[in-house]
């Protein structure tokens, strides 16, 4: 029901067949992706599968070399990149970091810090924060902007397991409260948010996509997580049965080479043990 | 006899005052720019731009154009050449800087040697001649310097955002590439203005040492910029006074004074809280 309601929501970002080409190879290619207001889209996939590249295209940090990316006019983005390193010589408190790209209301800054659970660190210098604290500070900064689109590249880095669950719950709450769209990257194949509306698996291209409900039925999910974290965690488990070649073509499990992999099909609900020639990233 | 001494004092007063006024003016401009050079880890980059100034000097004499304009254009072109080579070359930035820095300096020296019809005081360009500063030079420093500071104030937020993280800046509409380009132009302008005062070889030290000395007293980027300006001004006053007292060259004396300030800033005073605050626990 919610799903159909969302179809009417304003489109924040729309990518059509988008790809980025660098040093003679495609980092990612043929990406079709839409994020609407109030929708949470999660990208998963192994290292080097083009998740960060896709996200950077979506928000205009990278320009696509083919295909098209369309953003809502005057789209306000809140971005938490994968890695931020700030030189020690730059004196920057958490509070000051909040106003990095725009002046903010003092109250909103306080609320965002509170929501991220680091209100007590408002005056601390960012270089003194632990990895998890800094990640929360970056999240608070993105939240305080009250963005239309919240973009998070592996937001749980350096955060322990309980912190991870709390952080995903927080992101889901924010979506519910503000109605923003969320584009999320998770490198962990076993942990994606139950609140996610769409899961997209990347591996140089879009391998598959679907609702997490489909994924929740998977027997592996029940075996690994049980009912314990059923509201928050889901497992997304499948085998890749094809290999991506350097020129962008695809070698399938039976050895045939095709131009792309949209022709075949992944089944998430079953254990795809038949994928002999693939690069399985199911753990 | 008595009249001559009085006359001498007046003259001394005059050129010394001019040197002080010029040096303090320059320090105020260089402080905030120097902070960005330190934060962005661009010390060697600044050095390269400064070295290219000698090529600018030679070309200005060759084509009989305004010296300041010639130096500005060549320094700006050197920074553009570097940006281009960084994107399209295979050499590391470090190696590129080494090549550009010393080849532009050498080219300048060779060209000056060829132009036997002009007598050029190389030492004045390499190490500065602050005691020969004219009223026109002072007008140039204050006029040009005010313009540089105004543009920097206008550019402050995008440039700081790009310094912290260019991807966040790009995603949130701060246009980091443009900010970086304008910052290069400001650097080139500052080098053109500063050359006569401290000389090509020592400009970078005036950029970096006062900023480094100011770091310990700063809790925000803005305070550090002001602290760097003040530290620079103190170095100018101290260096020039010492140069008059001990008959040492003015440019190097200013740099030595700045170095002493920096070393003093490293001393931990028991009554001053110098360590960055970290009030929070770890996640």
Swiss-Prot record, chain A:
Residues annotated for ATP binding in this entry: 45-52
InterPro entries (alphabetical): AAA+_ATPase, ABC_transporter-like_ATP-bd, ABC_transporter-like_CS, Metal_Ion_Import_ABC, P-loop_NTPase
Membrane topology designation: Peripheral membrane protein
Domain ABC transporter as annotated: residue spans: 13-228
SMART domains on file: AAA
Gly residues biased stretches: 272-283
Top EC class for this record: translocase
Catalytic activity, as annotated: Zn(2+)(out) + ATP(in) + H2O(in) = Zn(2+)(in) + ADP(in) + phosphate(in) + H(+)(in)
E.C. number(s) listed in UniProt: 7.2.2.20
Keywords: ATP-binding, Cell inner membrane, Cell membrane, Ion transport, Membrane, Nucleotide-binding, Translocase, Transport, Zinc, Zinc transport
Subcellular location: Cell inner membrane
UniProt GO BP: response to zinc ion
Gene Ontology cellular-component annotations: plasma membrane
Stretches for region Disordered: 264-283
Listed GO MF terms: ABC-type zinc transporter activity; ATP binding; ATP hydrolysis activity
Broad class of the protein's primary localization: membrane
Family listed: Belongs to the ABC transporter superfamily. Zinc importer (TC 3.A.1.15.5) family.
General function of this protein: Part of the ABC transporter complex ZnuABC involved in zinc import. Responsible for energy coupling to the transport system.
Record PANTHER family: METAL TRANSPORT SYSTEM ATP-BINDING PROTEIN TM_0124-RELATED (PTHR42734), ZINC IMPORT ATP-BINDING PROTEIN ZNUC (PTHR42734:SF9)
Assembly information from the UniProt record: The complex is composed of two ATP-binding proteins (ZnuC), two transmembrane proteins (ZnuB) and a solute-binding protein (ZnuA).
Name of the molecule in the record: Zinc import ATP-binding protein ZnuC
Taxonomic classification: Bacteria, Pseudomonadati, Pseudomonadota, Alphaproteobacteria, Hyphomicrobiales
Annotated gene: znuC
